[in-house]
Amino acid sequence: MARLGCALVAMAALSACQTPAPPMPVQSPPKPQLSYLNIAISIPLAPVAAAVDNEVPRTAGVAPFEYWVNGGANPPACGIDAGYAVARGPLVMSGSGNAIRTDMALSYWLQGRKQIPCPGDFVTASCGTDPEEPRTARVSMDTAVAILPDLTASVHSNLGPIVPGNRCVLNPAGLDITDALMAGFADGLKPVLANLDQRLAAELQLRQRVEAGWARMNEPVELRPGIWLAMNPEGIGVAPISVSNEELRTGIQLRLRPVVGAGGKPEVVARPFPNADTAAAADTFEMHIPVEVEQSFVQARLDDALDLKNGGTTVSLGSYTVRVTSADVYGEGSQVAIKLLFKGDVNGTAYLRGTPFYDAGSRKLSFPDLDYTLETDRALLNSANWVAQGQIRERLRTRFTVEMDRPIEAMKQSLENVLNRQRGNVNLHGNVQELHLVGVYRLPNGSVFTAYLAATGKIWAEVDVQ
């Protein structure tokens, strides 16, 4: 009898006071995470070689004895009357590491005459003329390429050794002039080096093309009506140059902080084009997706868990009963709060707080760690065995779930559609590989329950360098 009296006194005290709503921690929406968009750039070397090839003559020469050396063979100069022909093969580009090798084959003949003594009879000597085969040599040019911070190209070619395929011995004099000829060829090939550098530098002028892509990335894109994706580019990296399989490869990496938000089109923030640094060894992106569910839908799930449509869940206090008649849920950041009103032999308010859990397999939100707040505990736990036993708490933990499949799938599809499209001269590709919960937001009296999910995956692109 005494114990029952104590319980009634406690219940009376509970019904006489209204427990204030527990304050929720004030938090801002999740901060945008750093993400990476890698843009692969491949430049076939064959078209570059062909362009240079078209600008460099294939042949050069002078008919026999029409090229005068040291004034020609006649007195008083008493020099040499000469003639020659040089023909080259096509330029062939290859490479390895970060260097380009350009190879070219040469064939030539040489003929000259001199008066010995002077004046006197002409003595004629030659190499590579009929009946001999033309003489040959191989030329190689090595080109070092680098992309500078302003995305211009530094290109510098050097002539390698010119290797004779056979010797040029002037017969019948027996004079070997091969080495002198190779030195002369080196001087004559300097214009080819300059032409090669100019052509490669023009192919690698990436700044104008990347600037266009940078401007496009600054433009928000509408995922769904009223839902916008802003990429927010903030930096550029350059991938090291490599040459293999007759292609020069490099890449541009855009560092982004993508944001998905609701409302009107976000204001475009003009971001100056930055100098580039070295690309990071990363290829992932992460963006926070606000998945909005109407509060009425969430409320219906809570009502179902507590059987409110049928009058509410009833629990026993010995010979007394208490019934949950109303419930509300709101949230901010990493936690949610549930407000319960109950009536019966005792009236009162209780609050529970817990951390939402997102099951990626079922795409449901649940609240497995819901528990009464300290404000409620002081009033209820000492007076109501049903609360101590956790009947309502366990019911909510197991039955209160929010299906997120439809809004998540719709948002995921919208996002992947945007990540797989042409944006100016940038052809995007991307996929969402994983979703996990960051936080849940719904203020008291708010009409929308928003779950922020972190979408992680990969995004890459090709840029039109033509």
Where are these regions (language model features)?
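Conserved short S/T/G-enriched processing/targeting/catalytic segments and their helical context
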Residues: 10
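C-terminal motif of bacterial Sec signal peptides marking the signal peptidase cleavage site
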Residues: 13-16
